Amino acid sequence: MFAALTLSAQEVDKAVVTGNADAAKNAGADLQKLEQGEKAWKFDGTIGLNAAATGLINWAAGGKNNVNGIAYAKLHLLYHKNAIAWETNFDTDFGLTWIDQKEDAFQKSSDNIKLATKFGWEFHPTWYLTVLGSFQSQYALGRNYQDGYNPIISKWLAPSITDVSVGIDWKKSYNGADFSIYLSPIAGRITTAYIGDAWNNRYNKEYQDAYAAGLIDPSKYDPNYDLRTELQESYGTYKYTDATTKEYRNFRAEFGLSFKGAIAYTYQDFKLSTTLALFTPYQGKGFDLNGSNPYFKYSNCNRYFGMFDVDWDVALSYQFLKCLQVTLQTSLKYYPGTLIENANGDLAERVQFKGVLGIGVGYSF
């Protein structure tokens, strides 16, 4: 019996020692994580300036001296702790081109603002109940540069797109790549084409002065020109009250279905990111316009369920020599109901595409 009690006491002592050792090991691991800087917040991104210049002297093939510069930033902020994930992305760029000519020497070449944030609660591994909000617009006036008068085709808040939605987000990391797929059946979208009275009056006068100076072809002159109406017509912020009457508004509000997919991959000094965003409104085609609109058959102007707004962005960057960077950025857009004028002056719904390849000073972190 004495031997049994002695053995039992030894087992108890062994268990206590083992438990203390495990506790010490876990505490050491936690301390090591803390010392290694495993934090809830993570901030990374890419900023830079691309530039190019062309100089010509007695160049038989023709051309003009020009300088082009684009400043850009892609910033990403992530908070992830326990079951909470909060992610914010800010993408922006602005570019100007100087051309050696008397008229319109400075022309805007790029202009973009995109801010998106989403807050999620992880209810199952890699699955999040998420609230998402985003905004996109531009900084400065956009003009259609051509001979004579250059009409205004866009500005700050004309257009702008604001999205708010609630949905499910699947997030996964694998081999250096972060994947996200978000689907929301409860999504709101507000599209604006806003211009204040003072700015509207100013640019209406500019149009009339350009006509008086002979800069506008008389066959294309509109005596009732109004910039606000032009922009609201282009971006579809109006509503038909009957087959021939439009009620113009500063904004269009829609409720619908949205999808967003994203991939971000980093390998040493190489970075790739791409996002695809889709939205379709919960509404029908509307009533027949009986041919009163040359572009659309029905009153909802092709903005009905099954017709998707498309935004697809791709960004590639490679950093070398610590401060030099090669970048390629593309953006493809398609918005049903948005009319775009081509070189011949014809209006139609069109796929929009922008590609920028540059080399310049940049920094990734």
Question: Over which residues does each language-model region extend?
Answer:
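Outer-membrane beta-barrel "beta-signal"
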Residues: 351-365
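Residue-level signature of outer-membrane beta-barrel architecture
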Residues: 75-81, 117, 121, 133, ...
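Membrane-embedded beta-strand positions of outer-membrane beta-barrel proteins
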Residues: 45-47, 88, 131-133, 166, ...
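Cleavable N-terminal export/targeting peptides
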Residues: 1-38
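Transmembrane beta-strands of outer-membrane beta-barrel pores
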Residues: 49-55, 81-83, 92-98, 135-141, ...
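Extracellular loop and loop/strand-boundary signature of outer-membrane beta-barrel proteins
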Residues: 57-63, 98-105, 149-155, 241-249, ...
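Outer-membrane beta-barrel channels and translocator barrels
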Residues: 38, 78-82, 120-126, 173-176, ...
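Outer-membrane beta-barrel transmembrane domain signature
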Residues: 184, 188-313, 317-319
